C-alpha cells in the first residue's frame, strides 16, 4: 500500500485518481463479520440499536442487508436533510409503501420517497419498456394464429408484475413492476432478492461504499470529492473510512482487535506530513495490521490533469490500450489493477504525449495543401 501511495504522490502534479476500488481479503483471526452483522441488522429496526457508538454516527448514512429472501435498509435519519414540500418524490409509481405512521416511520418514508436508493435502481432496471419473447415468436411460426400469448398480471406478496402486449405483435411485451416495502422506524424492508449480489453494504456520508461478502471479504468503493488534492487527501479519506469502519466492527462483533486497529489507523489521520503517513502505513504492513496487510487493489483510473494543447493522434494507441481519450482532449488511464500496471501505463502515457507533441510541431510547420499524401499518412496514421 505505501509503495502505491508513494508512486501516486510522485505523479500527482500530472495525474489525479478518479475511480478507486479495493478489497480487504478475509482473515480467520477476525471472525465472521458478515454473519454477525447480518444477525444484528436482521433483528433490529432502529439505527441506534445496531450502531451503539454514537461517535461514528455522523460518518454512516445507511446499512443494507440483501440476500435471496430479504432486503433490509437501516437508515441514519440524522444524516439526511430536512425536505421541503417542493422536494422531488422519485419513486411513488414503483412502490406500495406500508408504514405504521409513527413519527419515526413517517420520516423514513419521507426519506425513502426522495432518495435514489438501490431499491429504486433495482426496480427501474427490472421494468422493461419493450421485451421480445422469442419463445412466443417460435409458437407463431410453428403454430399459426392459434398460439397462446401471455399478458396480464403475475404477483406475490411483495412484487406485482404486469405484462402488456400489442395485439398486432403479441410477442413484444411491455413489463412494469411494483414492489411492496414495509417501513418500520429506521428500517425499509422488502422480501425477495433486490440485488445481483448477496451482501451487506455500509454507505458512508462521504459516499464511500463498503460491500461485505459471505466470506467476510470486503470490496470498498472509495468516493472522491471535488476538493480532493493529491495523495495526502486520498490517504486521509481512506483511513477515515477505516477508522469508522473498524469501530463499527468492534461495536457489533465485540472483538477488541478492531478497537486496537482503529487507534493505529487514527495515528495516520493525526500526523500531517505525507512522509509520516507513509512511514506509519509501512509499519502497519510490517506488523500485519488488518486493512494494510490484507489490502488488495481492485481497479482504479487516473486522469491527466494538464491541458493537452497539441494535436491528439489516436493512431498511437493500441487497440487494447488502457489509455483512452475522451471528448478529443481528455486523457484517462483506465482499469488499472496493480502498481506495476499503473507504472507501466503512466510511462506509456508520458512517452505517447511526447511523441504527439513532436508530431504536432511537425504538422504545424508544414503546408498541408502542398505536402504529399504519404507524408501526411506517416504523421497521422502510424
From Swiss-Prot:
UniProt keyword list: Activator, Transcription, Transcription regulation
Protein name: Intermediate transcription factor 3 large subunit
Main function: Acts with RNA polymerase to initiate transcription from intermediate gene promoters.
Subunit-level organization: Heterodimer of a 45 kDa and a 32 kDa subunit.
InterPro entries: Poxvirus_intermed-TF
Any single Pfam family the record assigns to this protein: Pox_int_trans
Similarity comment text for this entry: Belongs to the poxviruses A23 family.
